[in-house]
A protein has these predicted regions:
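Post-HExxH zinc-binding segment in Zn-dependent metallohydrolases
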Residues: 127-129, 254, 265-292, 300-302, ...
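Active-site recognition of the HExxH zinc-binding catalytic motif
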Residues: 229-253, 271-274, 279, 317, ...
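A well-structured
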Residues: 1-164
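Flexible, glycine/threonine-enriched loop-and-boundary segments that flank and lead into catalytic domains
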Residues: 197-214, 223-227, 345-369
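C-terminal, non-catalytic "cap/extension" segments appended to globular domains
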Residues: 3, 241, 249, 276, ...
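Auxiliary, metal-adjacent structural segments of Zn-dependent hydrolase domains
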Residues: 144, 161-222, 234-235
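Long, well-ordered alpha-helical segments
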Residues: 82-94, 98-99, 137-141, 246-256, ...
């Protein structure tokens, strides 16, 4: 890992790195500063999310339209930021001796056991095994909603006519349910969650002007993790307590590993910790969702499956962008629209919603701007987490033991080594995706 990290830097690219940092900060500030007028009030992107899931068709569509209009008003700025980022990164790659940015991008992600050809094989398996299954999910959703298939973004966002699963209670109730879950899951998780809560190592309430997104990091001097997020009253709030805390738990388990650079494994390895923890929380879904627990479980599993094509498309789009840095913004949007037909045939790109209709939806995905090539890590990890889901259904105790085998080595092993150490099926190739499609179908 140190060798890979050393390959990513040269004094020659310092000006580009500085400009890259300025541009990604500009993007983050632009999204965080969003003031979206809706029904006489003003919302941030995060605060608008529950309204984009409203069971009322007209209100939900209007919320999506309001968000899309804000993005369209800032389209030129979003285009210019990304256009400059692509060209900057291409320059960095070439200065470091590469044909384009892609090899440098992989090195910056710390990829130590797989490359572009592995990702291309994974992509092909996703299209073959997961896209048809995800398509069935959305066809059934259209039938439930009484909508024509394919549906637009606003209708795809509503899983049930009665509304999507919502947490019961407010932030304090969700955090209390989280403590209960971790206390009952295992002695290790009980100790971990008490450290997090008792030392206020979470900042999760949404505020105007607060940066968007959610993440977990570590406070190295104190040997503890820290969670940042924005609660918004949706099931995403529970994901903070499961997903981000899954990252935090893994970091807590590896906090004393020396050298400190081995306390975190590579990115895709980390995402297995978080996505799998979401599935370990299933038996406690009633604590989080009350009467909506069954609805949540269905939505969670369906969402895990349908995410894989979307995330793979995000990665494919970035490969095209960096293989062809000369593309204009309009040509990039056309590529997104083309890929949508392959990976997301259930998504209708509506002309009445130009932000989505023109193929601009990728501009909502901050990783594309801030963390190139990160997104495939989510897809690989989701594949492994679905292996855990299948195990949890038959033997939760054995599943947890397998999870701890995967987690304990932290960054002392590569992703492929962690998979083998835990006795899991590698997500590369067709076997894992084929088996998941069979189990979930």
């Amino acid at each position: 890992n140190t060798e890979i990290s050393l390959r990513t830097f040269s004094p020659e690219i310092v000006p580009e790195l500085q400009r890259e940092n300025a541009l990604t900060t500009e993007y983050s500030k632009l999204i965080a500063s969003a003031q979206i007028p809706f029904e006489g009030q003003v919302y941030t992107v995060s605060q608008l999310t529950p309204l984009k899931q409203d069971p009322d068709d007209a209100r939900r569509a209007a919320a999506w339209k309001a968000e899309g209009e804000w993005y369209m008003q800032n389209a030129d700025k979003l285009d210019s930021i990304y256009d400059e980022l692509v060209k900057l990164r291409d320059t960095m790659g070439k200065k470091l001796g590469h044909k384009n940015y892609i090899p440098l991008g992989y090195d910056r992600m710390g990829r130590n056991c797989y490359g572009q050809e592995d990702v291309e094989r994974f992509r092909a398996a996703v299209v073959k095994h997961i896209v048809p299954l995800a398509d069935q999910v959305y066809r059934r959703q259209a039938e439930r909603l009484g909508k024509a298939y394919p549906m637009g973004y606003a209708d795809n966002a509503l899983e049930f006519r009665s509304g999507n699963a919502r947490p019961c209670g407010g932030p304090e109730d969700i955090l209390a349910a989280g403590r209960k879950f971790y206390h009952e899951l295992s002695p290790e998780t009980a100790e971990f969650i008490d450290v997090m809560y008792d030392n206020e190592l979470l900042d999760v309430l949404s505020r105007k002007g607060k940066a968007g997104g959610g993440y977990c990091t570590s406070l190295g001097d104190y040997h503890v993790p820290f969670i940042f997020a924005n609660f918004n009253g949706t099931s995403g709030d529970v994901e903070v307590v499961t997903h981000e805390a899954g990252h935090a738990f893994a970091n807590y388990m590896g906090r004393d590993i020396v050298p400190a650079s081995c306390q975190w494994p590579s990115m895709e390895s980390c995402e297995v910790h978080s996505m799998s923890m979401e599935f370990f929380a299933w038996p406690w879904a009633e604590s989080f969702f009350g009467g909506d627990a069954r609805k949540f479980r269905y939505t969670h599993l369906a969402g895990a499956l349908t995410f894989i094509p979307y995330g793979t498309m995000v990665d494919h789009f970035q490969h095209i962008a960096y293989e062809h840095p000369e593309l204009t913004p309009a040509e990039r949007n056309a590529e997104w629209a083309r890929l949508s037909a392959i990976y997301m045939p259930w998504m209708k790109l509506e002309a009445a919603q130009p932000f989505y209709g023109e193929g601009r939806a990728w501009q909502r995905q901050r990783h594309i701007y801030e963390s190139p090539f990160y997104y495939i890590d989510y897809c690989l990890a989701q594949t492994v987490s679905l292996e855990f889901w299948a195990m949890i259904q038959s033997d939760p105790k054995a599943a947890w033991e397998t999870y701890m085998k995967y987690t304990r080595p932290a960054g002392t092993m590569t992703f492929k080594e962690l998979i083998a150490n835990a006795g899991l099926v590698s997500p590369f190739g067709e076997d894992a995706l084929r088996e998941i499609a069979s189990a979930a179908g």
